[in-house]
Amino acid sequence: MPSGAFRCRSGHKAVVMANTPLFLGQNSSLPASPDEAVLDYVANPRPGALYMIRFAAPEFTSLCPVTGQPDFAHLVIDYAPGECIVESKALKLFLGSFRNHAGFHEDVTVGIGQRLFDEMKPQWLRIGGYWYPRGGIPIDVFWQSGPPPAGLWLPDQGVAPYRGRG
């Protein structure tokens, strides 16, 4: 293994990753699709510690697969890291790649959670997709990899249920 590198599991294979992130500090264009997006991972700075990382994307967008109209969501991703953590700029580019992707709310939300879990191999991961109403009905989608580790502090995701103007 090269000096300054670490091993992090990604998908079905072990990947040797440099300690230098792929995108951080670099000019990076938005991937054309989620399939083209590369998620980058760095070594967990606190291996062995039980803690949670939260990412919130309050202005997430994708496209309705039927009408082609934009759909908007507030995503909250929580995870207890294992050997590696997702690099935040890579995650931002991955999430941004959905703005021209057509998918149902359920597929988009669960797909994001499963890809992160499958590649990063955290101890635990959950995602909440709080979708804004289209056709008068808000849709909230929740997925988690399994029960959270005992002793992990799990704050509420902090997104109020949709109440409209009433």
From Swiss-Prot:
UniProt keyword annotations, A-Z: Cytoplasm, NADP, Oxidoreductase, Queuosine biosynthesis
InterPro entries xrefs: GTP-CH-I_C/QueF (IPR043133), NADPH_dep_7-cyano-7-deazaG_red (IPR050084), QueF (IPR029500), QueF_type1 (IPR016856)
Any GO MF annotation of the entry: preQ1 synthase activity
Species name: Novosphingobium aromaticivorans (strain ATCC 700278 / DSM 12444 / CCUG 56034 / CIP 105152 / NBRC 16084 / F199)
Family the entry assigns: Belongs to the GTP cyclohydrolase I family. QueF type 1 subfamily.
Active site: C64 (thioimide intermediate), D71 (proton donor)
Its EC number(s): 1.7.1.13
PANTHER family to which the protein is assigned, alphabetical: NADPH-DEPENDENT 7-CYANO-7-DEAZAGUANINE REDUCTASE (PTHR34354:SF1)
Record's protein name: NADPH-dependent 7-cyano-7-deazaguanine reductase
Catalyzed reactions per annotation: 7-aminomethyl-7-carbaguanine + 2 NADP(+) = 7-cyano-7-deazaguanine + 2 NADPH + 3 H(+)
Top-level taxonomy: Bacteria, Pseudomonadati, Pseudomonadota, Alphaproteobacteria, Sphingomonadales
Chief place where the protein resides: cytoplasm
Pathway linked to the protein: tRNA modification; tRNA-queuosine biosynthesis
